[in-house]
Amino acid sequence: MASTVDIASSFIEGAPPGELADVVADVKTLTSNGADIIPSLAPAFERYNETQLATVKLPGASQEVLISEYNKLDGNRYFDVESQTSFEVDHVTQEASAAQSYVLDSQNADLIKSLLKSLGAHAREHYPNCAYGVYPIENDSAVAILLVSNRYSPNNFWNGRFRATYQFPVSEPTTVTGKIQVDVHYYEDGNVALNTNKPLNLSVSSLSAESIISRIATAERDYQEDLNRAFVQMAEGAFKGLRRQLPITRQKVEWEKVGGYRLGQDISGGKGR
């Protein structure tokens, strides 16, 4: 039988975009240990932040940086190539501290910096509230490209997150593999979640940053168009069948007598006849 920590951990790791704090509050309320259970959930918070590409602001900075398995150092420290900074993360509060200078030690440093420049231009053009990163992986024989964009609208009862993770070996020609994930949660008078996962396998003839990011941008645009078509099909198909159909009486409404109808009386506050 699953323990309380296991169950609470699954809640943490399944938190919708932008709603981790709400889930944490619910966990404290639902468990007999209350806030005392939170330290036991540290591994779950770490997995959530790395998987969801959580973002944090560096001390004294406004730009957000990524948390992921690809830029992880020892302990709870991570590094950001663009700002040349390493930092410590409190996975529960999603706050960064103890920032230090960090110099990228990679034989592919020039390629990584070029990719960051091209990726930054692409991200700023197409994704609001985004963060991105490029990191050496697999003993410096490959490169990982990460992009996340969050859109939170709790006043309208929805939150969403776009995540893209790519990697490719440093060879020419090369193949970029990865996936695009889109998660949206709508929770006004209900609970509807959209979770998509699109695997990608992209052939790139040149190892230049422009060629790689251009190929990625095309794949993301194509997937967005696929999603748009899927939404139209759902609206006209499955969702249409869920809507309550109003009866068809084929009778004209005599508007001058609308006050005599029950609906008209309800609206005007009159009494029924």
UniProtKB/Swiss-Prot annotation:
GO terms for molecular function: actin filament binding. One of its GO terms (cellular component) is actin cortical patch. It comes from the Eukaryota. Its main location: cytoplasm. GO terms for biological process: actin cortical patch organization; barbed-end actin filament capping; mating projection actin fusion focus assembly; mitotic actomyosin contractile ring assembly; mitotic actomyosin contractile ring contraction. InterPro entries: CapZ_alpha, CapZ_alpha/beta, CapZ_alpha/beta_2, CapZ_alpha_1, F-actin_cap_asu_CS. Pfam families: F-actin_cap_A. Keywords: Actin capping, Actin-binding, Cytoplasm, Cytoskeleton. It is found in: Cytoplasm; Cytoplasm, Cytoskeleton, Actin patch; Cytoplasm, Cytoskeleton. Component of the F-actin capping complex, composed of a heterodimer of an alpha and a beta subunit. F-actin-capping proteins bind in a Ca(2+)-independent manner to the fast growing ends of actin filaments (barbed end) thereby blocking the exchange of subunits at these ends. Unlike other capping proteins (such as gelsolin and severin), these proteins do not sever actin filaments. Belongs to the F-actin-capping protein alpha subunit family. This is F-actin-capping protein subunit alpha.
